[in-house]
Regions:
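Short, conserved beta-strand/beta-arch hydrophobic-aromatic motifs that form part
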Residues: 1-22, 26
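Compact, glycine/acidic-enriched structural inserts
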Residues: 21-80
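Short, surface-exposed, charge-dense and proline/glycine-enriched linear segments
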Residues: 1-9, 60-66, 86-99
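Short, structured patches in soluble enzyme cores that scaffold and shape functional sites
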Residues: 7, 32-34, 104-106
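Residues that cap or initiate secondary-structure elements
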Residues: 9, 25, 36, 108-110
Length: 142
């Protein structure tokens, strides 16, 4: 069982929050997975110009305590700099990403815990700045 919460109804395939329950394989995640080509270009442009903003988000104590870092699944990372970007750009490791997500495995017991709402909310709150950054990128006109 799983559910997805979108953060912006006006954007197709907008960033959001994902809660997945599967025995011994539950997790919580957020961000945007495999955005469409034009959206990916907008996100990379935002990262290139506002790298410091993204760096602050992923270095934030709350984010790091819940998710450590953005997901870097090998299949979702380019081997080289994306077309049009300097391979020495300060944000090159972010620019190589094809998806901009963070996820964390969670114990199945959280779903029956009396504090379920509070525990899940703290994780979703930690993801909000990432989703805000991604929404800002997607709302930017070319």
């Amino acid at each position: 069982m799983a559910f997805w919460l979108s953060t912006n109804r006006s954007i197709k395939n907008s960033p959001g929050y994902y809660i997945h329950y599967e025995k011994d394989n539950s997790f919580i995640a957020g961000g945007i997975y495999c955005p469409e080509v034009n959206d990916l270009k907008k996100i990379r442009k935002e990262i290139a110009f506002f790298y410091d903003d993204l760096e602050k988000i992923v270095d934030n104590k709350s984010f790091k305590s819940e998710f450590e870092a953005l997901s870097r699944d090998e299949k979702d990372v380019l081997k080289n700099a994306p077309k049009g970007f300097d391979p020495n750009h300060v944000a090159i490791e972010f620019l190589k990403l094809k998806s901009f997500t963070a996820s964390q495995k969670i114990d199945d017991k959280i779903f029956t815990n009396i504090d379920f709402g509070k525990k899940i909310a703290s994780k979703l709150i930690a993801l909000k700045p990432l989703n805000d950054f991604l929404n800002r990128a997607l709302e930017t006109e070319d």
